């Protein structure tokens, strides 16, 4: 593992996840936080599948029930009503319609190019993303060129560049396994405090099947 990351034990990870889950379950959400409380709204997208615009590329006609552009207005509305918020993507954004195939097989991705989906996600101001199985459909070189255009980090803890090491903490990971971001959040009285928020991602083992 790269020296940039300190290994974390499975027990520590599970303990932290259990604590976070309990805190969420025991803390009812209200529209406005109390003076000694702060709410953080986590927004998540998944399975974008290159659907940037409200357009059905298979039917070759507009479809106002789909597209990241429609989601953008919802994201803006949530940010407007939330004192603190973050935007996360769960993966499967790179493949899934004819526009994705055109970029991969016809236009291609040169160094410095920004994929249309990544360009849209940059505009929306994503904080972090992870990979799905369909990010690998066009090969690793294409995927890395696409990820290079993102203005936000990607994490994946179980993607290695070769054989697994006997010691899991020494696996040669392809991208950073996790991220701990320090954010400044505002409570109900307007007081600001720093908090650390952790993100970790995993890909399914069936990548070569799907």
Which residues make up each language-model segment?
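Acidic, metal/ion-coordinating pockets
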Residues: 2-210
């Amino acid at each position: 593992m790269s020296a940039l990351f300190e290994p974390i034990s499975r027990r520590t990870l599970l303990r932290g996840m259990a604590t976070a889950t309990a805190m969420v379950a025991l803390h009812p959400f209200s529209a406005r936080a109390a003076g000694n409380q702060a709410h953080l709204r986590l927004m998540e997208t998944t399975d974008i599948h290159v659907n940037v615009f409200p357009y059905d590329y298979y039917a070759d006609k507009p479809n106002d029930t789909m597209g990241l552009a429609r989601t953008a207005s919802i994201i803006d509305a949530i940010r407007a009503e939330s004192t603190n918020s973050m935007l996360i993507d769960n993966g499967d954004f790179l493949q899934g319609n004819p526009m994705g195939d055109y970029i991969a097989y016809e236009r291609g991705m040169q160094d410095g190019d920004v994929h249309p989906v990544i360009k849209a996600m940059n505009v929306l101001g994503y904080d972090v993303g992870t990979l799905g199985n369909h990010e690998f459909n066009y090969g690793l070189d294409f995927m890395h060129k696409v990820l290079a255009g993102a203005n936000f980090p990607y994490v994946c803890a179980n993607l290695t560049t070769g054989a697994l090491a006997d010691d899991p903490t020494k696996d040669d990971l392809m991208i950073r396994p996790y991220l701990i971001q320090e954010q400044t959040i505002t409570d109900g009285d307007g007081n600001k405090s720093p908090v650390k928020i952790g993100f970790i991602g995993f890909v399914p083992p069936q990548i070569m099947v799907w």
